[in-house]
Amino acid sequence: MANIEKKNNSELQEKLITVNRVSKTVKGGRIFSFTALTVVGNGEGRVGFGYGKAREVPAAIQKAMEKARRNMVTIPLVNKTLQHSLKGSHTGSNIFMKPASDGTGIIAGGAMRAVLEVAGIHNVLAKTYGSTNPINVVRATMNGLTNMKSPEMIAAKRNKLIEDILG
């Protein structure tokens, strides 16, 4: 698993999660191409992922980075951790994440760790169940993070005060 990190001029953190060689069988033999899975984030709650395919590795990575920048979403964080425990799933991958106290760090494995790092989440406990395919894990993580709601969002939806929501 390749894990390359880079910061560009607009302060976006870019991480390459995986590069994979795939083949298409035709009458004359095999045609090889490459796929790349990347995540991009600003370290303050904005994160996106991209999946690019091309005949050459650099082109696949570039396509994936562009898609990741286009598909960024904002995640409501509190004290560099999650608002509440959450679950996410995509096909065979299921993930569970819960907020952790200051100084815990990111306790997560593989592709999920890269997503959490570029999103700016510093304290979290996370576990992957089922398939550990990086593409499915990243999609499950993004599904979970986008479904996270802040107390302000819940209060606005219910037409109540934030104090009523927090108890």
Swiss-Prot record:
One of its GO terms (molecular function) is structural constituent of ribosome. Pfam families: Ribosomal_S5, Ribosomal_S5_C. One of its GO terms (biological process) is translation. Residues 12-75 form the S5 DRBM domain. Part of the 30S ribosomal subunit. Contacts proteins S4 and S8. The N-terminal domain interacts with the head of the 30S subunit; the C-terminal domain interacts with the body and contacts protein S4. The interaction surface between S4 and S5 is involved in control of translational fidelity. With S4 and S12 plays an important role in translational accuracy. Located at the back of the 30S subunit body where it stabilizes the conformation of the head with respect to the body. Belongs to the universal ribosomal protein uS5 family. This is Small ribosomal subunit protein uS5. It comes from Buchnera aphidicola subsp. Schizaphis graminum (strain Sg).
